[in-house]
Amino acid sequence: MQVTPTLNEGLKRAFTVVVPSADLQARRDARLAEVAKTIKLPGFRPGKVPASLVKQRYGESVNAELLEEAVNDATAKLFEEQKIRPAMQPKIEVVSAIEDGKDLEFKVETEVLPEIEVPDLSGLKLTRLGAKVSEETVDKALNDVARRSRKFETIEEDRPAAKGDVLCVDFVGKLDGTPFDGGTADDVNVEIGGEGFIPGFAEQMEGMKAGEERVINVTFPADYQAEELAGKAVTFDIKAKSLKKAVDPAIDDELAKTIGFENLEQIRKIITEQAEGEYQQLSRLRIKRDLLDALSEKTDFEAPSSMVDAEFNQIWARVEEDRKVGRLDEEDAGKDEETLKADYRRIAERRVKLGLLLAEIGRKQEIQVSREELLGAMQQEARRYPGQEQMVFEFFSKNPQAVEGLRGPILENKVVDYLIELADVTDKEVTPEELAEIPPAEL
């Protein structure tokens, strides 16, 4: 195999590779011989088809298989000999394909991973925020539980519905005068002044009496989950059937038993544990973000542009989707596209650099992702698709890249845990509200 370097600029590398025909001919002949053993042609006994006929009929398909195999093998050997760690899948351009008596020639372009010097992190100082679960938080959650178990009693008085009342209605939603899917329902209890499933829906029923009919106009939010209705103005034909009042049950052991618990104390314990879990997740997001901010200041190496481009394209696809349905936050919505792209390219570069630095720290510290951890991640992914778990596992078994997509976040979190353990961490108690205001890490 002959290798000629054609580019060596920054992280970019390019080579021209020539594989002599003599190296390929033996493999090609062996492959055709294997084919000859299995094919059946009229007039010939199995395994006795002339080599010239086998070559005539199957030569092109064998050449195509051998071409891919030879290019992959030669590229792998090239990277090993040149000690290249490619940042992304290399670009291959075949100059001269496999033909009788001709060498295989192809070009390889790739970016290499940068040489990363892990900075000294021994003096790293971090603050770990935490919050305690208050009785007020537990009581509020219990009130929510009671509201979900409330009953509705009919109001016999003939009067208009007022705020706080519940109106039992039938409705038919129409888009451009035609009923739309999912827009029709009967015997729905609507709390007047409460949160309707569309802004303005419940409010316009105030003042209706049992037996009254009304047409109301509402506009679906731009980010409504049904794309065919997002941002659309529709009407609802409302028929009020009865006026009711909501009666919340007493918050006691009886309520606990009706929803499957032993007593009220058990519910309080579960609510407390769930809140503690949420606070711990928020606390980790904050300390992780602070850690990444500190690491980001020490990433003085060049990021492969191909990796930055790939990361940016993923981010920008989400941004465009959010913009399409009106989910962009106020700050981003006020920026022009050029500024917005520059901001998110900076984020993409930060993510790539931090990812490479964390991976290098993990490599040097020999931090590994175990088979059990990968299996756990696959099981967690499979639980998202009830009834299709086997299909999910088959997908992972056939797609190594998808498995690597699970491995990356696990390794990242293990490296983050290692670095937090290494740092000088100060614990600080804050309120749950202060903890909830903390934005997540960018990586």
Swiss-Prot record:
Task: State the compartments where it is located.
Answer: Cytoplasm
Q: Which UniProt keywords apply?
A: Cell cycle, Cell division, Chaperone, Cytoplasm, Isomerase, Rotamase
Presence of keyword Glycosyltransferase = no
Q: Which residues form the PPIase FKBP-type domain?
A: 164-249
Catalytic function, reaction form: [protein]-peptidylproline (omega=180) = [protein]-peptidylproline (omega=0)
Q: Name one GO cellular component term.
A: cytoplasm
Top-rank taxon of the source lineage equals Bacteria
What are the recorded Gene Ontology BP terms?
A: 'de novo' cotranslational protein folding; cell division; chaperone-mediated protein folding; protein transport; protein unfolding
Major subcellular location class = cytoplasm
Q: Which InterPro entries match?
A: PPIase_dom_sf, PPIase_FKBP_dom, Trig_fac, Trigger_fac_C, Trigger_fac_C_sf, Trigger_fac_ribosome-bd_bac, Trigger_fac_ribosome-bd_sf, Trigger_fact/SurA_dom_sf
Gene Ontology terms, MF aspect: peptidyl-prolyl cis-trans isomerase activity; protein folding chaperone; ribosome binding
EC numbers: 5.2.1.8
Q: Name one Pfam family in it.
A: Trigger_N
PANTHER family in alphabetical order:
TRIGGER FACTOR CHAPERONE AND PEPTIDYL-PROLYL CIS/TRANS ISOMERASE, TRIGGER FACTOR-LIKE PROTEIN TIG, CHLOROPLASTIC
Q: What is known of its domains?
A: Consists of 3 domains; the N-terminus binds the ribosome, the middle domain has PPIase activity, while the C-terminus has intrinsic chaperone activity on its own.
| Role played | Involved in protein export. Acts as a chaperone by maintaining the newly synthesized protein in an open conformation. Functions as a peptidyl-prolyl cis-trans isomerase.
Family according to the record: Belongs to the FKBP-type PPIase family. Tig subfamily.
Q: What is this protein called?
A: Trigger factor
Q: Which organism is it from?
A: Gluconobacter oxydans (strain 621H) (Gluconobacter suboxydans)
